[in-house]
Amino acid sequence: MLKYKKKLLLRYCLGTAVATALAIFAAEGIWLKGITGSFGDPIRFLRTMSLVKSNYNGELNSHQLFDGAIKGMVEATGDPYTVYLNQKDFQALSEMTEGTFGGIGIVFGKRGDDYIVVAALPDTPGAQAGIKSGDIITAVDGQDTASMNMEQIANKIRGHIDTTVKLSLKDKDGKTREVEVVRKEIKTPSVGGSMLEGNKIGYIRIAVFNENTAADFQKEMQKLQKQGMQALILDLRGNPGGILDAGVSVAGALVPKGPIVSVVYKDGTKYVHNSGLEKTPCPLAVLVDHGTASAAEIVSGAIKDTKAGKLFGVKTFGKGSVQGVFGIDNKTAVKITVAKYYTPSGVSIQNIGIIPDEIVELPEDATYDLQMRAAVDYLEKQLQQK
């Protein structure tokens, strides 16, 4: 999930216009009953609302009708990342980007008709239950996901702390299983690192790009440099992305002067985020996998295209779109795909992903981290050549 960080835009003018139109229709008692002909879209909407309210044999209110209408509008885009955020959804999104939220700690996306786990965040109930990147979510608490959108699935997975949710999963080999996971408060410390033993190589893992990532990454870099770091392994495996600006900031500390990513909007407007760095700080290796997505792919793509470092692992997820969150009121919002992004070489990775410089598989039965080993071997050779 890539949240384009910008101020929430409150569309009071649109809200006032709709409310005023409804008030006029109510005051004049216009039912539009039996009227035929071609109506403008706003009139069609108001006529439908009037018909439903007047004739539906059941309990409902105007709030329910507007809620349903908004959902219908965003679902009509056919884009799984463009969604209506009700009060619960909006609060959950805010909590996640701030670093604390409730649930089981998995991030998923949509590919074709399938809802695929992008990552199970480390040390969360989802990871502890054995949920892995690439697992397909087929049902939540017995309800088939084919009948739900992404936000509805997320809502069913979230819930009160210490309650249980049951997920039906299918792995990459087509084997099915069910897991019961106890919901917990999910805290996502974004950045962690240390020096590797026996060499001058530092290691930094970024789990997710949230509001604290850029500052935490700089602190970790400074700490490791004081400890004698001469080369760096950046671990972005299982990183589902997050805030665009955070990814740009991290890339800007690693790649040389020039483009990091280009963001192209609907009207053709193009914003190029640039690095001002004179040179890369040290030899760099980046670990990626199928769970590396979104903002993590921005960093990976910039490093690969500028040859600031070398990528090790397997092909990344392939999410190359940018979402903006726009406030409807102070409790609800819409998340809309507002742009696509392109790596410094002008490539869109949407539904394609990034292929590492060196493909290194990591079998489940591996006795050690083959991808990490390949990165260490590469950096040790780089240091010997200095």
Role assignments for model-derived ranges:
Residues 323-327, 333-365:
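Conserved P-loop NTPase
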Residues 2, 33, 37, 118, ...:
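Cleft-lining beta-strand/loop regions that shape enzyme active-site pockets
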Residues 1-110, 114, 132, 139-140, ...:
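Intrinsically disordered, Ser/Thr/Pro/Gly-rich linkers and terminal tails that flank
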Residues 114-121, 147:
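Short, structured beta-strand/loop micro-motifs enriched in basic residues and often containing a Trp
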Residues 138-139, 335:
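Hydrophobic beta-strand signal
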Residues 102-104, 284, 334:
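Short beta-strand or tight-loop elements
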